[in-house]
Design a protein with these regions (language model features):
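Pocket-lining segment of extracytoplasmic ligand-binding domains
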Residues: 96-98, 105-109, 136, 174, ...
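Sec-exported extracytoplasmic/periplasmic mature domains
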Residues: 59-66, 89, 167, 171, ...
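Extracytoplasmic/secreted proteins, especially bacterial periplasmic and envelope-associated proteins
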Residues: 49-56, 60, 79, 83, ...
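Ligand-binding clefts/hinges and TM-proximal coupling segments of bilobed small-molecule sensing domains
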Residues: 148-164, 238-306, 310
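An extracytoplasmic/periplasmic, membrane-proximal ligand-sensing/linker region
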Residues: 202-218, 274, 284-394
């Protein structure tokens, strides 16, 4: 019987993984012989917590099901999502770009893109926030005033979250010195003093290595003052405050609150239902084989996946899977249906909108304003219980 992947063996194996890596099973098992059984998943760069999680999952599914899975990596949001849209990849774990692509916002407000039929498949929770060195003198968000703050290259979603974190502390972009830097370059930037803070997953090989070299501190985003979060709905509607433990550099028993959201495994609406069902079933049934491979792998458990905030519809096959597993609710169905109708209206409007306004320098703002003025509000979800032991419920 195949053995579960250990975290140590996974990290050792990843040291030689290239940007486009074929992950073969770590043990004996059935093997696919037809190229149609190969899949490509796009995601973050090697060494990030997000990559580590997906490598463990892909390695396990390759070994257990025989379907070969390759990981394609990129350090930018567009670079992670473009392979999904152009057909190079069949699935993507690409950060909040899935939301902006669905909405056709920001970089996706272009002739090349526009609103895209993105669908959720698997939505593990995770915690992300701002980390500083303890010797920086920065103890709370308010202390970031006047400091060198990251502005991540080609990563609109994370920059919006970075703005929301400043707002939590009563600050705006004018209160900090922005430093343009890549997501992957932040750790070295913090070491050298290029930046005074970085935005990262609370776990991952790179961030843990940093914490082993320098005492670090996660800025807390907790408290009962709801006014501190009032800009989050507009800047990052997929986010909620969430408590976490066991983050890089944290002491035993220490906890903090930062941003909790899913970096989901996504696909397009056209992906075959039977394939998505097989994938969801494989993720659920083989969870025990990869759950201890990384600090966050446990969050891939079916009873922990996040169902809200819901800002992009689930794939039809995943809705059926959730129904069969008794986790789907009337509130989720109403929200999902409303998102599908929103998609229909956006796609119907888009060709004419772009033809009329594509040359306008303010086209991004105009598109957001058109949606605000013409699309119905999405219904709230009030009947979804907290995920089981997700380690991040506020």
């Amino acid at each position: 019987m195949p053995r579960p992947i250990s975290r140590r063996s996974l990290l050792m194996g990843m040291s030689s993984v290239s940007a486009l890596a074929m992950l073969s099973g770590c043990s004996s098992g059935p093997r696919a012989t037809d190229r149609s059984e190969q899949l490509v998943w796009s995601t973050y760069g090697v060494g990030t917590g997000t990559y580590n999680d997906l490598a463990a999952v892909a390695n396990t599914l390759t070994g257990r099901t025989g379907r070969q899975i390759r990981l394609m990596t990129s350090d930018t949001g567009i670079g992670r999502l473009a392979p999904l849209i152009n057909g190079t990849a069949q699935y993507s774990r690409a950060g909040d770009e899935y939301y902006y692509a669905f909405e056709g916002n920001d970089e996706f407000t272009s002739e090349t893109w526009g609103p895209q039929p993105v669908r959720l498949v698997w939505t593990p929770p995770g915690n992300y926030g701002v980390l500083v060195r303890k010797d920086s003198g920065i103890e709370k968000v308010e202390d970031l005033k006047g400091k060198k703050y990251p502005r991540l290259v080609a990563s609109t979603s994370m920059n919006r979250k970075l703005e929301g974190i400043l707002n939590y502390g009563g600050l705006t972009g004018s209160d900090v010195e922005f430093v343009d830097i890549s997501y992957g370059g932040q750790i070295e930037g913090l070491k050298t003093g290029q930046i005074d803070a970085l935005y990262q997953n609370v776990v991952g090989a790179n961030i843990e290595e940093l914490a082993s070299q320098y005492p670090v501190h996660w800025l807390d985003l907790g408290g009962n003052d709801q006014s501190k979060y009032e800009t989050w709905e507009e800047l990052a509607p997929m986010v909620r405050p969430g408590r976490f433990v066991n983050g890089a550099g944290m002491d035993e028993g220490e906890s903090a609150v930062n941003m909790q959201y899913t970096i989901p495994l996504t696909t397009l609406a056209e992906r075959p239902n039977d394939e998505v069902t097989r994938l969801a079933t494989a993720l659920d049934e083989n969870f025990d084989y990869f759950k201890s491979a990384t600090p966050d792998a446990k969050n891939f458990a079916f009873d922990r996946i996040l169902l809200e905030p819901l800002v992009v519809p689930f794939h039809d096959a995943m809705v059926e899977f959730l129904q069969q597993k008794k986790r789907w609710t009337p509130g989720l169905q109403a929200r999902n249906d409303a998102l599908l109708e929103r998609e229909r209206l956006m796609m119907a409007e888009w060709p004419g909108f772009w033809e009329e306004n594509g040359d306008n320098d303010n086209v991004r703002t105009m598109w957001v304003e058109w949606k605000r003025d013409n699309l119905p509000a999405l219904p709230p979800i009030n009947d979804v219980p907290e995920p089981s032991e997700n380690g991040g419920a506020a």
